[in-house]
Amino acid sequence: MISRLITVLKQLASSVDNAAFAAAPRPHDPVDYERPELDGSGPTAAEIPLDATKPGASLEVWPSRTLDGCREPLAPGAPDLRGVWECYQGRMAGHVERVEQAGDRITITTGGLVHDMFCDGTLENGVDDIAGFGGSKIRVAATFEDGVHKLRPFAKKVVAVTRRLDGDEMVWRYGPFRNRLRRLDSPPFDHPATRAAAQAADTMPD
C-alpha cells in the first residue's frame, strides 16, 4: 500500500501539458455553469449511482452531468465549489474542471475524466478510478473539513489534494503545487475548440 501511495505522489509531480489543457474544449452546455438552488427536490445524492471515467475518455469530450436534477443541500462543512473552473495561475494553468455537488457528494470532471465521491472518509464511497488520462489506478478517501475538500489516497494520513474557496476563487493544492482557479459564468464560445463542440452539439446561442 505504501508503494502505491508513493506512485500516486510521483504522478502528482509528473510533467504537465499546459498547452493541451489550454487548447481543449471547455463544457459547451450553458447549464453546466449554473448553480441552482439546493431546495431538496429531485433524487438524493445517495440515490444516484457513483460515476466513473469511461473507457476511451479524453480531454476532448465532456460527459453528461452526473448529479443532474439532484438538489440536496450541501453537507455541513462543505464549500460550494459548484460550477466550471479554469486554472489561471500555477502548475496546472489551462486546466478546466466542472464541479457538481449535492449532500456530502462531489463530482469533479475534466473532459472525460470523472472523479465522483461521497466525502465520508471511506474508501468504499470514495474515488475508485484512474489518477489521470492513462494514469495508475487509485483509491481515494474524501472528506469535507471546515470548508476544505480533502483527498487522502488509500485512506492514509497524507492529504494529497485540497480544494477550498478564497473569495470568489478556488485554491487547489495538487501535491506540493498551489493553483488558483476562476469560476466561469458561461461557455467561452470565442475559444475555438469550445465553439466547435457547441456547433457540433447544436448548443450555440442564436
Give the ranges of each region predicted by the language model:
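A short beta-strand motif that forms part of the nucleic acid-binding face
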Residues: 155-156, 176, 185
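Contiguous, well-ordered beta-strand patches that form the walls/edges
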Residues: 90-91, 111-165
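Amphipathic/hydrophobic helical signal segments and adjacent flexible N-terminal regions
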Residues: 2-112, 184-206
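Short, exposed beta-strand-loop hairpins at the edges of beta-sheets
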Residues: 170-176
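Short, solvent-exposed coil/turn segments at beta-strand boundaries
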Residues: 81-84, 99-107, 119-127, 143-148, ...
